[in-house]
Amino acid sequence: MNRKTLAALVGAIVLAVASSGVALAAGSGPAVTVQIKSLTKTLVKSASVHGEKGSITKGGTPRGKCPGNTAAGALDAATHGKWTGKYYASVPGIFVTSILGVKPSGSDFWEVLVNGKASNSGICAIKLRAGQRLLFKIAK
């Protein structure tokens, strides 16, 4: 095999390995479906996402306190980071204050339903499982 052919072959292999690594780095963990609804409209109809690598650090959350492979990571992926929250060490977790610019009014709040059932856990404690359906909606 001549040098040019060998160099081209090695280059193609390196490129293939590098591009597959980039695809893997885009998400972490199993695929879940995220839907987001305000009181009056659907903000995200249905997005298939993976959690995120590392930690979610919204609202002053210390690194490592909210893993990216949780509902918080799925929310972050589905909204491209366009949500806000406040970290509470006593819970510990993030209380969601707005999603895609929508803030609940009065005593309303963002809640998460997992496979159609209201979760008793915060978004940092809901570990992602393949095929899971997450609905973030404003509750009264």
Predicted regions and their residues:
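Ubiquitin-like/PB1-type beta-grasp interaction modules and other compact soluble beta-rich domains
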Residues: 2-140
